[in-house]
């Protein structure tokens, strides 16, 4: 009995213990299941996996769900991480963890929420009519290819150069006043014979002929002026000093000819100083917003809709955007424009909703249809140029007293009308006789000029095959055969003012050289560095001018001058009628000191000269032919800055071991009279042609003659170095080449030496050095 009871009791205790152990296991499995389900839910939500709406659609079989991805290639809306999800799109969590069945069977999300592109959507809408396309046409040859793909092997900063199409360069500009003033980059319009500006509005686009009002190479800015047929929409130049690193910005422009292209980024840094293609710039804004060829001159825009920079350059190893772009600060652009125009629009509201602009309408006249309502046939009371505009551009037109209103003539003709001579008399009597004829018609130069395709750039008379001589801007027109009615820039290169040097034409083959690696640090020395201008009405800036093109003293140049590399600055070219020329500086000199301070880089010369007021006599220590001498340079106004000649883009290297040969070289038997050397064809030896209206051109050494380049083969060594047709080669490795015999001897000596070849070149009254 006792034994039996003991067995029963033991068995009972054993069964109870087994049940308790099973409960623990079941509870543990439940907890693990809950954790797994909850983790899966969190993972799907955080990894962008299957969305709740899609999960419910699968479970409930709903076919009419609204929140479905965009189909047929239409991109779905992207939600900015900083934006909150709309309340109607949120889904309540399940009532119990892991209980999928507790979701409601159908959830009505309503219409799909419209997700905007953030605060910049309204900004782009605000500025879409303030950004223009700038086309600069210049004479030249073919675009030079880059067969090796070495566009910029050093990865140095270079200008976001305009898209080059043969001899047309396409950039971007910003309307800064609604009466036709536009800011763009200097390098977009530099050397252009004609400039065209395409302005867009809500209806279409209008192409205007533009006038270059002002240029500043140190700032890389240019001010254009067009005569608008309608009121324009001006952008507001904001305060670039108020922009902080990491602030969001957008870049608007015409990359590769694709107008109104918008890219987004941030302000990556603020650069105190930076050298771009030989020019020292200050306070540039660095951004990662995409800037490409054609973006030059376009706006960099802050979230409040104001322009905080003018896109100008990129840092790239291969010519493509590499995430580093630079913009001229808007404060510099404002001062640059104010020196000429007197006033600019200012914002009256801040923040993303900004849209009101003060001083946008001079003398209180409304913009667009904001003027008072007037009756049809009311004569224009204006005398400031608006009397030539269509009244409907600013006013709403109501019928006259008899209730009848004549049909309005559209500004743009629906069908392109025929081209007409510039002096044609308007045959219209329906009101169009009061309009500007080029609103509808394209002008041709004169009675003998044939029609040209509508909408193409106007070239009334084809320029001669040989480039005409450079002339001064105010030179009198000597023609009487109809060309007196033409724009002189159609055939001639225009020099800005008395003593100004010709603006160098585009690089070899007609392509702008901004896309090539800057081998020399040639710099237009003027101050304040970076182009800080003075506020209008201050009596001008304290800027000083040297008037010389400088380059660092390299090791080979140092050997030639018996100086260690970096001690001094090499003078690569001197502009006539500038302080540098008056002081006696010559190409080939080495500047050792400026105002008693040693200099080692062109930027140091720029910084010292920037401190000097106008009229100050500055002592310059110069090394020439082994002798050190001091020169007194009197600084001049910054208005002469555009006169400085551009140094060649190739590295300047003095060829050693090639002494100057005095006297006349002995005539070598069978001297050729035509030369085909390094891609150059040379047939003629001549004295340089004088530049019309420009005294003080540099005389040619060695008897006054040189070897004229008849043609340059595209892609050749000569083309890559920057030589152009009609250049006059004065010296080859310090040997004068005034005759075929001398050139032949110089070529043979240079070939035998096996070194780089240094050419002294004369172009448009200027001498400079080019290395081959």
From Swiss-Prot:
Heme 1 binds at residues 391, 394-395. Residues 43-772 are lumenal. The protein isolated from magnetosome membranes has a molecular weight of about 36.3 kDa, probably due to C-terminal cleavage. Subject to autocatalytic cleavage; cleavage also requires MamO; these may be the same event. It holds the Pfam family Trypsin_2. Its main location: membrane. Induction: Part of the probable 17 gene mamAB operon. GO terms for molecular function: electron transfer activity; heme binding; metal ion binding; serine-type endopeptidase activity. Residues 522-626, 696-765 form the PDZ domain. A motif (MCR 3) lies at residues 470-494. PROSITE patterns: CYTC, MULTIHEME_CYTC, PDZ. One of its GO terms (cellular component) is magnetosome membrane. Signal peptide: none annotated. The keyword rRNA-binding does not apply. The active site is at 187 (charge relay system), 220 (charge relay system), 296 (charge relay system). SMART domains: PDZ. Its EC number is 3.4.21.-. It is found in: Magnetosome membrane. GO terms for biological process: proteolysis. Probably binds 2-3 heme groups via the 3 magnetochrome (MCR) motifs. Coiled coil: none annotated. Residues 445-558 form the Cytochrome c domain. In the N-terminal section; belongs to the peptidase S1C family. There is a third MCR motif in this protein (470-494) that is not present in the M.magneticum strain AMB-1 MamE ortholog. This is Magnetosome formation protease MamE.
């Amino acid at each position: 009995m006792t034994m039996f009871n003991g067995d029963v009791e033991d068995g009972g205790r054993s069964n109870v213990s087994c049940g308790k152990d099973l409960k623990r296991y079941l509870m543990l499995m439940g907890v693990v299941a809950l954790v797994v389900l909850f983790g899966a839910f969190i993972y799907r939500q955080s990894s962008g996996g299957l969305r709740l709406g899609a999960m419910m659609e699968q479970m409930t079989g709903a076919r009419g769900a609204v929140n479905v991805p965009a189909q047929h290639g239409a991109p779905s809306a992207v939600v900015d991480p900083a934006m909150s999800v709309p309340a109607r799109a949120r889904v309540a969590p399940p009532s119990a963890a892991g209980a999928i069945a507790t979701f409601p069977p159908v959830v009505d999300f309503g219409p799909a929420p419209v997700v905007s592109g953030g605060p910049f959507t309204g900004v782009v809408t605000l500025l879409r009519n303030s950004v223009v396309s700038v086309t600069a046409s210049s004479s030249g040859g073919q675009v030079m290819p880059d067969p090796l793909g070495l566009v910029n092997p050093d990865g140095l900063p270079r200008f976001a150069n305009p898209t080059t199409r043969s001899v047309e360069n396409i950039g971007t500009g910003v309307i800064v006043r609604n009466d036709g003033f536009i800011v763009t980059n200097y390098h977009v319009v530099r050397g252009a014979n004609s400039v065209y500006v395409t302005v867009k509005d809500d209806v279409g686009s209008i192409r205007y002929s533009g006038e270059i009002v002002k240029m500043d190479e140190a700032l890389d800015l240019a001010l254009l002026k067009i005569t608008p047929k309608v009121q324009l929409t001006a952008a507001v130049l904001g305060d670039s000093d108020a922009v902080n690193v990491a602030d969001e910005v957008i870049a608007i422009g015409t990359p590769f000819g694709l107008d109104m292209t918008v890219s987004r980024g941030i302000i990556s840094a603020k650069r105190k100083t930076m050298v771009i293609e030989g020019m020292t710039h200050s306070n540039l804004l660095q951004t990662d917003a995409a800037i490409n060829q054609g973006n030059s001159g376009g706006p960099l825009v802050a979230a409040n809709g104001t322009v905080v920079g003018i896109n100008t350059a990129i840092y790239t190893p291969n010519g493509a955007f590499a995430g580093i772009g630079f913009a001229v600060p808007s404060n510099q652009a404002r001062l640059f424009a104010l020196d000429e125009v007197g006033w600019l629009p200012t914002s009256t509201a801040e923040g993303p909703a900004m849209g009101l602009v003060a001083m946008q309408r001079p003398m209180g006249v409304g913009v667009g249809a904001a003027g008072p309502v007037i009756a049809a046939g009311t004569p224009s009371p204006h005398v400031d140029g608006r009397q030539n505009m269509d009244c409907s551009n600013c006013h709403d037109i109501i019928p006259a007293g008899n209730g009848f209103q004549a049909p309005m003539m559209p500004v743009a003709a629906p069908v392109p009308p025929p081209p007409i001579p510039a002096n044609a008399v308007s045959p219209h009597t329906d009101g169009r006789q009061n309009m500007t004829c080029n609103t509808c018609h394209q002008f041709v130069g004169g009675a003998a000029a044939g029609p040209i395709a509508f909408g193409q750039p106007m070239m009334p008379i084809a320029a001669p095959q040989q480039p005409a001589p450079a002339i001064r801007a105010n030179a009198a027109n000597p023609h009487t055969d109809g060309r007196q009615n033409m724009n002189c820039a159609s055939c001639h290169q225009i020099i800005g003012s008395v003593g100004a040097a010709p603006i160098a034409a585009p690089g070899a083959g007609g392509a702008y050289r901004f896309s090539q690696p800057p081998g020399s640090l040639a710099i237009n020395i003027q101050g304040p560095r970076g182009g800080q201008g003075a506020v209008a009405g201050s009596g001008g800036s304290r800027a000083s001018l040297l008037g010389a093109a400088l380059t660092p003293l390299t090791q080979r140049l140092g050997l030639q001058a018996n100086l260690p590399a970096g001690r001094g600055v090499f003078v690569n070219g001197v502009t006539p009628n500038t302080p540098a020329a008056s002081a006696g500086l010559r190409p080939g000199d080495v500047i050792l000191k400026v105002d008693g301070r040693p200099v080692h880089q062109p930027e140091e010369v720029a910084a010292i000269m920037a401190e000097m007021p106008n009229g100050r006599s500055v002592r310059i220590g110069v090394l020439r032919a082994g002798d050190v001498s001091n020169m007194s340079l009197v600084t001049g106004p910054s208005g002469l800055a555009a006169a400085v000649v551009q140094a060649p883009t190739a590295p300047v290297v003095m060829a050693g071991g090639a002494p100057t040969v005095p006297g006349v070289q002995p005539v070598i038997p069978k001297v050729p009279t035509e030369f085909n050397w390094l891609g150059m064809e040379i047939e003629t030896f001549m004295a340089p042609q004088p530049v019309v209206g420009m005294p003080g051109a540099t005389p040619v050494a060695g008897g006054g003659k040189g070897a004229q380049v008849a043609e340059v083969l595209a892609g050749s060594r000569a083309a890559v170095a920057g030589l152009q047709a009609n250049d006059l080669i004065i010296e080859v490795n310090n040997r004068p080449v005034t005759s075929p015999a001398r050139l032949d001897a110089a070529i043979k000596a240079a070939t035998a030496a096996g070194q780089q070849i240094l050419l002294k070149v004369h172009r448009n009254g200027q001498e400079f050095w080019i290395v081959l």
